[in-house]
């Protein structure tokens, strides 16, 4: 019994210390980016020896993988579970929440989607999250089909990619400030409206068959 209590206390201390380390790493990353974060610098901020921090994280990459997981949990928590009365608003809600995430958690959005230096920190958790979100979005598309707002043969995968691009691009513009004159909040609304118009008009239908490969006439072949 005593051994179990000691083990639980040690585990609790270990987890708390890991969270504190991640908080320090997150702060350093927010201020000056991926290159500014080193295991030695984080250890110094924590009052550790340079070697002691490796007990909690074996590498900088592992530390950022844990930070990326935190960002994913925040993003998933922001993904809607509710259903709105209007099917179009209901469809767009996950994409609007994704765009809002870029503004409420810009450092995590940058880490997850924009920072090439931190790209190695991403992996299966990110893929699994996207898969869960995709299943939810497909259900929202099917509701629009059932209610006669979109044609039955709409290509849901392509349509979903269009909506994602409509929010991701303005999110990046908002975070980078480039181009400086652009107004991402206005752009995202215009792009979403344009995508919905394309869906309603039947411009994003499933192909009847795979495009045939073009071949040159026999006389034109070398």
In which residue ranges do the predicted regions lie?
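Alpha-helical DNA-contacting segments of helix-turn-helix folds
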Residues: 63-71, 112
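Hydrophobic alpha-helical connector segments
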Residues: 80-108, 156-163, 208-218
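Hydrophobic alpha-helical bundle segments that form small-molecule/ligand-binding pockets
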Residues: 119, 132-159, 174-180, 202-208, ...
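Helix-turn-helix
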Residues: 2, 16, 20, 24, ...
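Amphipathic alpha-helical packing segments from all-alpha helical-bundle domains
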Residues: 80, 122-147, 157-165, 189, ...
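Short hydrophobic clusters on alpha-helical segments that form packing/core surfaces
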Residues: 21-29, 71, 75, 98, ...
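N-terminal intrinsically disordered/low-complexity leader segments
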Residues: 1-16, 176, 206-222
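Amphipathic alpha-helical segments used for helix-helix packing
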Residues: 103-121, 172-178
């Amino acid at each position: 019994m005593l051994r179990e209590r000691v083990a639980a206390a040690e585990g609790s201390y270990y987890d708390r210390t890991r969270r504190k380390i991640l908080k320090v790493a997150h702060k350093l990353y927010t201020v000056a980016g991926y290159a500014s974060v080193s295991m030695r610098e984080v250890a110094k901020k924590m009052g550790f020896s340079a070697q002691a921090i490796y007990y909690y994280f074996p590498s900088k990459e592992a530390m950022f993988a844990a930070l990326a997981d935190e960002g994913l949990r925040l993003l998933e928590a922001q993904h809607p579970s509710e259903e709105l009365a209007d099917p179009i608003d209901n469809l767009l809600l996950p994409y609007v929440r994704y765009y809002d995430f870029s503004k409420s958690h810009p450092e995590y959005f940058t880490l997850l989607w924009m920072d090439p230096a931190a790209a190695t920190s991403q992996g299966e958790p990110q893929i699994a999250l996207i898969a869960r979100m995709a299943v939810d979005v497909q259900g929202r598309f099917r509701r629009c089909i059932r209610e006669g707002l979109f044609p039955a043969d709409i290509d849901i995968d392509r349509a979903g990619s269009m909506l994602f691009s409509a929010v991701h691009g303005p999110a990046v513009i908002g975070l980078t400030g480039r181009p400086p004159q652009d107004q991402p909040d206005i752009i995202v609304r215009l792009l979403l409206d344009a995508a919905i118009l394309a869906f309603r008009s039947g411009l994003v239908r499933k192909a009847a068959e795979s495009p045939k490969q073009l071949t040159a006439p026999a006389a034109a072949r070398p």
